[in-house]
Amino acid sequence: MCNKQQCISILSKASPFIRKEFGVKSMHLFGSVARGENTEGSDVDLFVDMPPKALRVVALRYYLQDLLGTTVDLIRNHSRLDSFMIKEIERDGICIFE
């Protein structure tokens, strides 16, 4: 499990590969890790803008879980996001890359 600064550092360093391999246009960290409130059982919440190709989304999630050493909850940017989720991302979100 990584803390906020560790997650930001790891993801920032991996961003060229993530962009190229998975077609991710932007990534934001949000949730308990972004707020500095994570516990040992917390997952890492990431909001990404990427093409809607199911296999790539699944592959990215597995890659990120291996990279960060914990469970990753990957939320893709799309028009069906509920307003609560959008507000949480806007409130807590930390831009990793755009």
Task: Give the predicted meaning of each segment.
Residues 1-26, 34-40, 50-98:
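Catalytic core of pol beta-like nucleotidyltransferases
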